[in-house]
Amino acid sequence: MGKYQERLDTVDFPYDISYIRWSGHGDNAVPDPELSEFIKGWNETYEWPKFHISSTSEAFAAFEKRHGDEVPVMHGDLSPYWEDGTGSSAQETKMSRVAADRLTQAEALGAMFSPTVSRTAKVHEAWRNILLYSEHTWGAWCSVSDSESDFTKKQWDVKRQFAVDAESLSKALLSKVMPAAGGDAASIDVHNSTSWVRNELVVLSAAMSAAGDHVKTERGASVASQRLATGELAFVAHAVPAFGSARFHLSRGKALAPAKRATFADGVMENGVVRVKIDAATGNLVEMMLHGKSENLVDRSKGEGANEYLFLEDADVTQVQQAGAATVRVEEVGPLVVSVRIESSAPGCNSLVRRVRLVAGEDHVELTNVVDKKRAQLNPHPGKGGPGDDFAQREAKESVQFAFPFAVSDGTMRIDVPLAVMRPEADQLAGANKNWLPVGRWVDVSNAKHGVTWVTLDAPLVEVGGISANMLGSQRDPDKWRKHITPTQRFYSWAMNNHWGTNYRAYQESVVEFRYALRPHGGYDAAEASRFAIGLSQPLVATVASAGAVATPLLRVEPEDVLALMLKTSDDGAGTVIRLFGASGEERKAKVTWTTGAPQMWLSDLSEQRGKRVEGEVLVAGWDLVTLRADRV
């Protein structure tokens, strides 16, 4: 207690209430029966300070009552520390992330096509699995020091099953909400589960596209298509309405080539909108620019390329290793889709395969990195020692990174975080982690004239400015942690690691796919970055056309920088719930217009209960989430 009081005095703690957390001896401890007697004895012996056993809520309620008006208001991101473990099981993290987006789509499409059908129990079960995979209790205390024990394996089996079940449940729900197929297998319906109009590539399986290579819209206009080397059929679905569908027809005619073709020659991939160059020796992207612009948006000053594989053993970043010589092979020659396969040897892997894809007319390039990971070294003395010993804390540590150095003069980096956008350093609170940062869907680097939006679909951690996630084991010395992030346009996707000494996985092995996208652009637009990223993670869904006409779009949200992040049937089955997000960061007056009927709408919250009646527009603050409930008439 003397040391604690000294610490309060050192920092000039100005309040007369403090909160001390006691969780027993170690985390996840059982209640401590000695605590009550200790507090009783202390209060009887000493006049000051007095102790009260309380819950967190009680303690902070007492603090707020006495000092609420004196507490300073702080704004910013308290970037966390524990999330490094998501990279210790990259495949399962990917499964859970994808399942969350798939489930969001299933709920929206269910509200569009069968709003009176209740799926609440199954939806809640799927979300429960997603949340329990994301929850911090990853595995056994000896997961690194004794990784092959039944104790460790059984706990990991339980944890992994949450991701497996989330994946299977979300797939089943998405399949179940889709309209039943009609009798015309040559007609395809393309469904949009988001609140903005979409123009995107759709890929049909060989079986689904057996009717032919030529594609027409419902009005008879031909659209660009291409039979891929895999047997699949790719075509561009134009003007798929928000929360609606568009119908396309296949026939035996010749595929229509786009007006401006996508090409690949001499290492250069271009489509009249975007141009990228792949280095033949390394397979890295060494140039990227918008058509008509001279600025190369890839920073080559340190010899790195974009999407470069980097492998770090232990903590010395000067010893980082690159992939071996690349073999570059064209898989799709265009004219609609160009795809290049880049195969390399890679330290820490059995193989590394990277793919770069560009679609005619699209303003971005897609990257797919397939890592066939080798298993890290196991503890040579399993069962001896524990998470605090040398092996668990410092030995056989490794990580996989992909580099993204951008050349945007005086560019500001912005990171998508839950319901906000964060600038490293500038928007971080004191005490925030600066060695690694979680990312939702995208990072943008831009100045007033141009920039790049980077999207990650599977890997949720980045290192900013350099490889800075090299804190092995339990680093308790605060002076070892990074204190500042200087302005930079360079970052690294921290895809895999085994750095922590307990709970998280000791190793990963076999195949994991990491997907990214790069979109060069003009000035920064936060809402456009979110639309782009959500569009990739919640793609258009194609089905064999249903009987009858295409359903009318359900509703329209205005303005375009207010996004509906959620559309679902209410849990009670009596209405529809919409969650509107102020994606521009600026206050907007939003309007929801229903295409058929005009249901009564109320402000609501997570309870989905009716609040204040909504007439006309609703105010949506920047980065705010506003929930509306609409009851069917």
What are these regions (language model features)?
Residues 4, 171-633:
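C-terminal (or distal) subdomains of carbohydrate-active enzymes
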